[in-house]
Design a protein with these regions (language model features):
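A short loop-to-beta-strand structural motif that recurs across blades of beta-propeller domains
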Residues: 17-20, 58-61, 114-124, 163-165, ...
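Conserved beta-propeller blade signature
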Residues: 8-11, 48-51, 89-91, 153-156, ...
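Residue-level signature of beta-propeller blades and closely related beta-rich strand-turn architectures
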Residues: 15, 55, 95-96, 160, ...
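Non-cytosolic beta-sandwich-type ligand-binding/adhesion modules
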Residues: 216-259
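Short, conserved, GDST-rich strand-edge loop motifs in beta-rich repeat architectures
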Residues: 94-118
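Blade-level signature of beta-propeller repeat domains, shared across WD40, Kelch, NHL, RCC1
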Residues: 191-219
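Surface loop/turn motifs at the tips and blade-to-blade linkers of beta-strand repeat domains
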Residues: 31-35, 71-75, 135-139, 182-186, ...
Length: 259
């Protein structure tokens, strides 16, 4: 995180859970040393700098060098993303599974080299008085990025299906916890979202891409549903479509996990 007022860059690190302050000459010093294994994310609002950690999913408010206080200890085992604006903090607190372990021929246990398993995502809001409220939950995947728009709407990126959700934290923005898909891309992970410019932008991983969001509607769109396991012999029903424009349906069935 770049602090223009202090002309310093703050860097969150692991595995020792330290936040470093780096001046324009490249000199660094430890600004905060957490008891947690990793500091995963930083966010600022005015003079306050916030840090999210793994292990116990704690959010700290950093008021100065080695001056920190706990904002909240969230359920889960990591705070992956933070966003702060006008006294409100948005927190992505995930419950991530432990890495799979495999045993080699020499009986040494090591982490398996495969795509990480998705966790369970929880989106929280902390108000200016420190009250925490859960706004949204996602049991089929975890959250990886956050941003707060001018009207207080929270944009939350997913780490499994390449979607960004719009979640309204206030009654005039759709009601607490009301979520709708805002963006859906082919890439699997949404890693960062920026709403500070003329047009929102976001970056993805697996694979890497940079997107700019425009107001124009796309010429065409594709939506793929999740696989439905009927668990016994089943028969197709009927598909109905209500709306304008040309639409095409394609279906697939079979006896495998992914037909």
């Amino acid at each position: 995180h770049w602090d223009a007022g202090q002309s310093r860059l703050f860097a969150a690190t692991g595995p020792e859970g330290k936040v470093f302050a780096i001046d324009p000459q490249g000199r660094s010093e430890v600004y905060f040393d957490a008891e947690d294994g990793h500091v995963l994310c930083l966010a600022a609002d005015g003079d306050a700098l916030y840090a999210g950690t793994d292990g116990d999913a704690v959010v700290y408010r950093l008021r100065g060098p080695e001056r920190a206080e706990v904002v909240h200890d969230f359920p889960g085992n990591e705070v992956t993303a933070l966003a702060a604006r006008d006294g409100m903090i948005a927190v992505a607190a995930n419950e991530m599974p432990a890495p799979r372990r495999v045993t080699s021929k020499n009986r040494r246990s090591k982490a398996a080299s495969r795509t990480p398993r998705p966790g369970k995502g929880r989106l929280w809001r902390v108000d200016a008085d420190g009250r925490a409220e859960r706004l949204h939950r996602h049991d089929d995947g975890h959250f990886t990025a956050l941003a707060i728009d001018e009207d207080g709407t929270i944009l939350v990126g997913e780490g499994k299906e390449g979607r960004i959700l719009r979640v309204g934290p206030y009654a005039n923005a759709g009601g607490p916890g009301t979520a709708a898909t805002w963006v859906d891309v082919d890439e699997r992970q949404v890693l960062a979202i920026d709403v500070g410019g003329d047009r929102p932008v976001f970056v993805t991983g697996d694979s890497a891409a940079l997107y700019r969001v425009t107001e124009a509607a796309p010429d065409e769109a594709l939506w793929t549903s999740k696989v439905l396991d009927a668990e016994f012999r089943a028969r197709w029903g009927r598909l109905d479509w209500r709306g304008r424009g040309r639409v095409q349906f394609q279906t697939r069935s079979g006896n495998t996990e992914e037909p």
